[in-house]
Amino acid sequence: MAKKQFTLVVVRHGQATHNLDTFQRKDMVLTENEEMPFMNSPLTELGQKQAAMVANRLSKTKFHLGVASDLCRAWDTAQAIVKANPSLEKVEECRLVRERNGGLFDGEHTLCYAQHTVEEAIEDRELLTWRIPNGESVVDLRVRVRAFLNDIQAKAAAIEVENPTILVATHYVWMHELYHVLAEMSLALRGEKRGKKPRTPNTGVDQYTLTTRCGEDGQHVLEQVVFDIISCGSHLDSVSTY
């Protein structure tokens, strides 16, 4: 069946209020009218400047599609990129790329770091089924990441360009898990084991070149994953990052 190669340019949001060392849970902003609310922190002034910097970095990239988390820190970062890029008129809302819901740990930097440290020690991430109270497990997040990959392969295949480029504006932990999932696929496909993902700064960029094939059942299957750029914040050289 027909193959399609496409590029994902994945961008973390600019600095948000919950990234500040002074942030407290009492300052938290949540999404409304949801059974499981998500933290919905706005960009700081620095975060807005960072968004403008990554927008300038990507201003000459020809995008054929853009998707973004609806959480305002990622959505507003995406809007800055749209404003600076003549090839991209808008981005589509995609809740699959929302940040992992940290539940009671959201805004608690020490607890989040401890949780991350424990989870990184487990090689088989499908074992990480424990949910943070009022939040998501790693496995819950991986379900969303895989659903996104299925969806974006279908969308890429439908774009009438040979090698389309797609913008994804999202979040730190989501990007971390996407890397894990793609690294596992790359290992299964080609026996190539990837190292640990470096820390991604605010507005840091990952770029992947993916090759997909549509099977006889109509389902898309990844055949190759190329890790082009990982955790790059070169556009932030003169700006403090979190």
Model-predicted regions and their roles:
Residues M36-M39, E120-D140:
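Short glycine/proline- and acidic residue-enriched helix-loop micro-motifs
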Residues M1-H64, Q79, K83, S87, ...:
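An N-terminal RHG(E/S)-centered segment typical of histidine phosphatases
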Residues K49-I122, G195-D206:
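Phosphate-coordination/substrate-recognition cap region in phosphate-metabolizing enzymes
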Residues T7-V11, V161-V173:
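Beta-strand elements within well-structured catalytic alpha/beta cores of enzymes
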Residues M1-T7, R100-C112, A158-E162, Y179-Y242:
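Acidic, low-complexity terminal tails and accessory targeting/binding regions
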Residues K60-K62, I152-P164:
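Glycine-rich phosphate-binding loop signature in dinucleotide/nucleotide-binding domains
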Residues A68-S69, V143, A169-T170:
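Short beta-strand scaffold positions
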